[in-house]
Every structure is written in structure tokens, then in C-alpha cells.
């Protein structure tokens, strides 16, 4: 699949790390380092603009290494970029650790996954089909 992209950063285009990778790393495109204090969140620019085909979305997901080693993740995860959005891709990051974390220009800050999606059409009804689970949720299927 070919996707149009504008790159206003001075970093390489996002790329798959391996032939089986689902996500491509996105990089911060900032003029000076940004320090996230504990529990602080900031919108981090990437310098990237994309044009997705209708029927596709781009999902923005955390990088597992940043989350594990530094407690850095995304506030809305996954974030969704719709096919009709044409603005800059911005990443809402948060520091869930107890120590400040500094983001440098060019640092890999998240992953982007391209995914097909459907649009649902609601069918209004007064009842739903019975299932074994029923209305049980929030841990109802077991604790082990």
C-alpha cells in the first residue's frame, strides 16, 4: 500500500524495523529538548502529515521500551488518525514515573500502525441474543 506523506522534520521517514513488523517508529520533531515532569503530559510534534485511503486508520501506540524503562506512554492509546485528517501528527505523551524524562529531537517516541476498519450501521432493537456470558463483565470470566 502506498500512502502520501509530507515530512517537515529533518528525520528519515518512518520505516518498519523488520519484514514482520506491524508498526513504524515515529520521531519527535522539536527545536529543543522537552522535559516531562512526573505526571506531566505534552503534545509532541512529529513534522509528519499523511493522506490515508478511505477505509484505513493510523493507530498511534506506545513504545514498550519507553514504557518499561522510563514509565513514558501515551495518554490516549491507541490514538486514531482518521483518513480525512490532514494536520500534523502530534503525540500526547505522559510521564507516569517519579523522575523527569527528557525527549530529544529525533527520539523514537511511539509506533504507527496502519489498519483497515469498517463503519458500522446501527440496527435499533429491543433485545439482544442470549450468550453463555450474558451481561457479565469487568473480570466476570475468571481470575486465573
UniProtKB/Swiss-Prot annotation:
Necessary cofactors: Mg(2+)
Keyword Transport: no
Species whose genome carries this gene: Porphyromonas gingivalis (strain ATCC 33277 / DSM 20709 / CIP 103683 / JCM 12257 / NCTC 11834 / 2561)
Name this protein carries in UniProt: Deoxyuridine 5'-triphosphate nucleotidohydrolase
Pfam family, one: dUTPase
Alphabetic keyword roster: Hydrolase, Magnesium, Metal-binding, Nucleotide metabolism
Pathway in which this enzyme or protein is active: Pyrimidine metabolism; dUMP biosynthesis; dUMP from dCTP (dUTP route): step 2/2
SUPFAM superfamilies in UniProt: dUTPase-like (SSF51283)
Amino acid at each position: 500500500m502506498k500512502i502520501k506523506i509530507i515530512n517537515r522534520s529533518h528525520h528519515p521517514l518512518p520505516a518498519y524495523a523488520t519484514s514482520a513488523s506491524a508498526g513504524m517508529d515515529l520521531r519527535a520533531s522539536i527545536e529543543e529538548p522537552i522535559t516531562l515532569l512526573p505526571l506531566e503530559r505534552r503534545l509532541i510534534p512529529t513534522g509528519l502529515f499523511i493522506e490515508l485511503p478511505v477505509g484505513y486508520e493510523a493507530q498511534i501506540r506506545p513504545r514498550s521500551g519507553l514504557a518499561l524503562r522510563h514509565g513514558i506512554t501515551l495518554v490516549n492509546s491507541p490514538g486514531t488518525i482518521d483518513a480525512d485528517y490532514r494536520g500534523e501528527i502530534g503525540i500526547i505523551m505522559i510521564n507516569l514515573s517519579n523522575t523527569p524524562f527528557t525527549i530529544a529531537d529525533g527520539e523514537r517516541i511511539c509506533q504507527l500502525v496502519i489498519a483497515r476498519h469498517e463503519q458500522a450501521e446501527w440496527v435499533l432493537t429491543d433485545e439482544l441474543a442470549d450468550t453463555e456470558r450474558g451481561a457479565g463483565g469487568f473480570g466476570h470470566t475468571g481470575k486465573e
